[in-house]
Amino acid sequence: MSSTNETNQVLQRLNSLKIVETPKEQHEFGKRECYSLDSKKYSLVPATPSSSGHGKFQTELKKRRKNKLNRMYTYEADKNFIKARKSLNF
């Protein structure tokens, strides 16, 4: 019996809520980092909708990050290989 009462209260609260759209100025101040409202201002945000068409994203940043990671991995691998080579007296 108490659970139905609680659901009724929740439903009443939901009904009393009003849907308000945030003005565009407030959107731009870091509220939504995942995409930009105009891609000219934030041209290199990851997954920014590009001007080349609907559903396409700019991936320059991702590529750059991947290259950096690969560089770090190869450096670590080289370091370990040099250590192993020294221990085996090649």
Curated annotation (Swiss-Prot):
One of its GO terms (cellular component) is nucleus. One of its GO terms (molecular function) is cyclin binding. GO terms for biological process: cell division; gastrulation; negative regulation of G2/M transition of mitotic cell cycle; negative regulation of mitotic nuclear division; ventral furrow formation. Its main location: nucleus. This is Protein Z600. It is found in: Nucleus. It comes from the Eukaryota. Residues 46-65 are annotated as: Disordered. Component of the Frs-CycA-Cdk1 complex composed of Z600, CycA and Cdk1. Interacts preferentially with CycA (via C-terminus) but is also able to interact (via C-terminus) with CycE (via C-terminus).
